[in-house]
């Protein structure tokens, strides 16, 4: 009722400075009313901020920055004597917040002089994290004369200094790291946390460090807010405030859970609801009927543009309507009239880069070399070769063997990724055994690729059941989803529709994480088949999945006349059901492999979920069932981009990488384990009638943990699940847990990644330090998939037992709930879920031997080779030039940044890409020096040589030798033996050769 009540209040006179609402959704609706009816009032929207007092704010970092940004905006508007109002979820107003003096910003002006040490100190006291690389808000870096600052709720800026003078200010893109062209004259730098000086910073730091709070990071980011004392204020008391009735209910509920003292809210005025005023929720398909029903009311219709407005008017009786082009979302009814909007809220997608660099090479990590196999990356080292300095990666192999890999050949290695429980073994250098192993794997991969291509070719010859995909009912079906489709879902639906309406049978793989909306996309296809008179089968590997899909489909198709049935080992009257399927009395049949023997009257579509989990015989039966019908396979296992491209030569691939708009990242807490904390975590979830995953990765002691939990919380209903429990019993336990008959699932790992358990929204991970970064991220992703917020607790037995690297990793996970869906994550997901079954045949043995990256690359090559595509060039050019060439540490001080650039340069496929990286280096680090420029020339030579079939470039003094793959040699003479002359002579010659070749 927020919009209609607020509209009424505005008409009666409204001079409040704060409006507290139930949640962000209600706040958003209220802001629309203020913005439309009081356009001169600055309406500032606060985020939800569900931190409880003394919570570690790293887990709420993004919202905390937004909250401080909104508050700073409010103080500035008051200072400028501008009429303003804060509209906030009540959760954002429950704690005292910083006064104006703690949120002061400062300016940096072009051509002014600044002491860089003082600037660095100031940013540090303002809460900025000083790092090598700036990627997210609240970070800054100082690299010689170049300073990067990413201001919260603002933009990322790059400043260039000449001595102390600021000679350039530009924005830069934190994802590409490249600055934009336009120069700025002045920028404003707000604090990330609070505007403190050295003295006030030290005072606050001391208060935090001396507090008894349980945390691994007793710093201002985590706890500063709770110790501001008189420098913070209760906004609801200081400024004239009013709350919505639903916000009052929220306060009362929190009070009933003893999380809040109700007394401090008693003085607040409550926004009144009144008769004749109500908020509306009208779906597009019901609009015409609604307007006809209210023809005696004055109706105001809002639309984002003239086209949408004209289309609406032509379909409606516009006699009593006032039409307005405005972007606001207003849907409410008053005694005087009705407001209806054709607009919807636009969720701004944050372009964000993952801070958790999963593919970063760190010393001590396992790597696999294309020719020499599995070893351990030791360090980045510099050696003199032929009297010149070059950089190498040192890789340790079996025994005392070491390989020095020139950095220009970094593309020959990849991080070793197999299954997370497999322990790699080092290979021995010089025995040739790894090359034999590769040859064996290649033979097997050619066999697999051949089968895939053969099947695709067979299916390609079959005429498909052509469907009409432009039916109006499909649009109505979409509008009843209850949520907005993501752009990925829209794209996948369009791709599937194109397949269904062609003359060929569809063969498409739909991949996407659990909760990303694969089932909705599949249901759209099933409904399309139904409208065209065809039956569909949805085949799943487990009874629990069958049960879940059946409930989902039954609810979704309830009003659309689709008859849905389920066939699994629990289904009663199987024969009767099979007869109904044969007679065409069932439109969509869902079930386990029990479906595979069913006879259909008019089967048009087969959808399979998690196909790789079926056995060999079941896969054969599946192939038979789907032989001449449209086939859609769904998988929660992501596919790395390059393999995706190779597979797309022979089958359709759609990927869902965007989470649903209302999905919130799970809150993550890193804590030292104790009994009180465990009780608090479990009760916190039970109070909201939820369930808990408790991960304890040690079967031998799992019963002890169960006993301990039962001692702490008597009557707690706990189920145990681990790999030694047989499949049927495991499934039974999961079914009981899904039904809510257990409160805690105590297990060694979440056995079934594809299962959606919307009521389990807290996960506790015992001894989190023993898990890999990707495992922890995966486990965290198991909660927070429904409407409720997820909570993830990484518990450590003893803080002192953690090394610095492990602590850093865990703190990074705590602060960064976002993880990019890039290539590295796909590999790591495969590591956890076991990528061995990716193509339906278990290949985990081969993957264990050669690692996932090399395996997929070889598979891509096999597919390209057999389907007549382009095979990658495997030859590496050997560079034996007496030239000093490396990325200079004086220019790029950080080893990890240099290593990243080396990796990217080694992967360049053309000289344009090298030129782009050259520009980027100058932009990010300053003018490039001779040594770094010479390394870029070496990379350019390597690319040109590859194009000409050259395998080696070498020199002795000014005499240069070029060796071709057919052993032919060519000699050149440079003007001198200087590095520059050698490189220029070679570049000029190779470019001329390529020009001749192109003629």
Swiss-Prot record:
InterPro entries assigned to the protein according to its UniProt record, in alphabetical order: CarD-like/TRCF_RID, CarD-like/TRCF_RID_sf, DEAD/DEAH_box_helicase_dom, Helicase_ATP-bd, Helicase_C-like, Mfd, P-loop_NTPase, PriA_helicase
Source species, domain of life: Bacteria
One Pfam family hit: UvrB_inter
Keyword DNA-binding in record: yes
Catalytic EC class: hydrolase
Binding-site list for ATP: 512-519
Compartments reported by the entry: Cytoplasm
A GO cellular component annotation in the UniProt record: cytoplasm
PROSITE patterns reported for this sequence: HELICASE_ATP_BIND_1 (PS51192), HELICASE_CTER (PS51194)
Keywords: ATP-binding, Cytoplasm, DNA damage, DNA repair, DNA-binding, Helicase, Hydrolase, Nucleotide-binding
Main location: cytoplasm
CDD domains: DEXHc_TRCF (cd17991), SF2_C_TRCF (cd18810)
The Helicase ATP-binding domain, residue ranges: 499-656
Family as reported in the entry's similarity comment: In the N-terminal section; belongs to the UvrB family. In the C-terminal section; belongs to the helicase family. RecG subfamily.
The protein's name in its UniProt record: Transcription-repair-coupling factor
Organism: Helicobacter pylori (strain ATCC 700392 / 26695) (Campylobacter pylori)
Gene that this sequence comes from: mfd
């Amino acid at each position: 009722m927020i919009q209609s009540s607020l509209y009424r209040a505005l008409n009666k006179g409204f001079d409040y400075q704060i409006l507290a609402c139930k949640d962000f959704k209600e706040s958003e609706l209220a802001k629309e009313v203020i913005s439309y009816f009081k356009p001169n009032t600055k309406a500032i929207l606060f985020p939800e901020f569900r931190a409880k007092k003394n919570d570690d704010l790293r887990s709420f970092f993004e919202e905390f920055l937004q909250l401080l940004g909104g508050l700073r905006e409010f103080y500035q508007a008051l200072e400028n004597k501008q009429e303003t109002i804060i509209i906030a979820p009540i959760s954002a107003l429950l704690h005292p917040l910083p006064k104006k003096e703690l949120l002061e910003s400062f300016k940096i002006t072009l051509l002014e002089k600044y002491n860089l040490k003082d600037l660095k100190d100031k940013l540090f006291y303002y809460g900025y994290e000083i790092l090598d690389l700036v990627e997210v808000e609240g970070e800054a870096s100082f690299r010689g004369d170049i300073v990067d600052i990413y201001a919260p709720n603002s933009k990322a800026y790059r400043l260039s200094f000449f001595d102390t003078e600021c000679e350039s200010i530009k924005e830069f893109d934190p994802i590409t790291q490249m600055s934009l062209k336009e120069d700025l004259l002045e920028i404003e730098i707000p604090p990330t946390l609070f505007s403190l000086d050295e003295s006030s910073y030290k005072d606050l730091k001391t208060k935090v460090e001396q507090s008894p709070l349980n945390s691994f990071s007793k710093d201002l980011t985590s706890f500063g807010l709770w110790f501001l004392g008189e420098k913070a204020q209760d906004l609801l008391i200081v400024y004239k405030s009013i709350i919505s009735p639903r916000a009052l209910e929220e306060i009362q509920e929190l009070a009933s859970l003893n999380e809040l003292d109700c007394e401090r809210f008693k003085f607040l005025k409550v926004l009144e609801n009144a008769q004749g005023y109500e908020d509306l929720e009208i779906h597009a398909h019901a609009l015409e009927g609604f307007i006809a029903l209210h023809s005696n009311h004055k109706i105001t219709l809002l639309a984002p543009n003239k086209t949408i407005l004209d289309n609406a008017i032509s379909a409606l009786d516009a006699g009593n309507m006032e039409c307005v082009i405005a972007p606001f979302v207003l849907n409410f009814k008053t005694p005087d009239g009705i407001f209806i909007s054709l607009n919807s809220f636009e969720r701004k997608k944050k372009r964000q880069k993952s801070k958790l660099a999963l593919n970063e090479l760190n010393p001590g990590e396992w790597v696999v070399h294309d020719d020499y196999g599995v070893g351990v990356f030791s360090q980045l080292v510099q050696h003199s070769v032929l009297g010149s300095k070059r950089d190498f990666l040192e890789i340790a192999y079996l025994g005392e063997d070491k390989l020095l890999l020139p950095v220009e050949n970094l593309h020959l290695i990849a991080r070793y990724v197999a299954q997370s429980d497999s322990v790699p073994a080092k290979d021995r250098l010089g025995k040739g055994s790894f090359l034999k192993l590769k040859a064996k794997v290649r033979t097997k991969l050619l066999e697999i690729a051949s089968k895939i291509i053969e099947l695709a070719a067979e299916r390609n010859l079959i005429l498909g059941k052509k469907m009409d995909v432009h039916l109006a009912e499909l649009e109505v079906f979409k509008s009843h989803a209850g949520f907005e489709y993501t752009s990925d879902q829209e794209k996948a639906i369009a791709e599937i529709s194109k397949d269904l309406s062609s003359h060929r049978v569809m063969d498409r793989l739909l991949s996407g994480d659990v909760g990303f909306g694969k089932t909705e996309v599949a249901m759209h296809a099933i409904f399309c088949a139904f409208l065209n008179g065809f039956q569909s089968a949805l085949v799943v590997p487990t009874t629990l999945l069958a049960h879940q899909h059946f409930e989902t489909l039954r609810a979704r198709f309830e009003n659309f006349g689709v008859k849905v049935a389920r066939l699994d080992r629990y289904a009663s009257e199987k024969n009767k059901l099979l007869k109904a399927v044969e007679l065409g009395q069932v439109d969509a049949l869902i079930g386990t492999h029990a479906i595979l023997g069913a006879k259909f009257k008019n089967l048009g579509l087969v959808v399979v979920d998690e196909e790789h989990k079926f056995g060999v015989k079941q896969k054969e039966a599946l192939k038979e069932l789907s032989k001449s019908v449209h086939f859609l396979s769904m998988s929660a296992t992501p596919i790395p981009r390059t393999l995706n491209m190779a597979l797309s030569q022979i089958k359709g691939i759609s990927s869902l990488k965007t989470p649903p708009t209302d999905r919130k990242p799970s809150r993550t807490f890193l804590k030292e384990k104790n009994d009180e904390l465990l009780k608090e975590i479990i009760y916190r979830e039970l109070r909201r009638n939820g369930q808990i995953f408790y991960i304890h990765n040690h079967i031998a002691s799992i019963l002890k943990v169960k006993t301990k939990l039962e001692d702490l919380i008597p009557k707690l209903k706990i189920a145990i699940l681990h790999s030694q429990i047989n499949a049927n019993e495991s499934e039974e336990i999961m079914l009981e847990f899904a039904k809510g008959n257990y409160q805690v699932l105590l297990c060694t790992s979440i056995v079934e990644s594809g299962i959606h358990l919307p009521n389990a929204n807290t996960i506790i991970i015992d001894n989190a330090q023993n898990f890999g970064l990707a495992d922890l991220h995966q486990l965290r992703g198991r909660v927070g998939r429904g409407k409720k917020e997820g909570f993830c607790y990484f518990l450590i037995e003893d803080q002192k037992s953690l090394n610095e690297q492990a602590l850093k990793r865990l703190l990074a996970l705590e602060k960064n709930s976002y993880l990019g869906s890039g290539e590295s994550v796909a590999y790591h997901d495969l590591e956890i879920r076991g990528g061995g079954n990716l193509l339906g045949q278990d290949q985990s043995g081969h993957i264990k031997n050669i690692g996932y990256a090399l395996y997929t690359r070889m598979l891509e090559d096999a597919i390209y080779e057999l389907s007549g595509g382009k095979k990658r060039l495997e030859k590496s050019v050997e560079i034996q030039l007496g030239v000093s060439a490396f990325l200079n540490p004086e220019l790029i001080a950080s080893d990890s940044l240099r290593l990243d650039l080396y990796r990217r340069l080694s992967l360049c496929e053309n000289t344009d890409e090298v030129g782009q990286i050259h520009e980027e280096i100058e932009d990010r680090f300053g003018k490039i020096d001779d040594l770094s420029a010479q390394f870029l020339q070496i990379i350019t030579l390597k690319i040109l040589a590859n194009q000409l079939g050259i395998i080696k470039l070498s020199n002795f003094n000014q005499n240069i030798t070029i060796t071709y793959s057919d052993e032919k040699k060519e000699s050149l003479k440079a003007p001198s033996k200087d590095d520059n002359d050698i490189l220029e002579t070679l570049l000029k010659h190779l470019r001329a050769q390529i020009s001749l070749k192109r003629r």
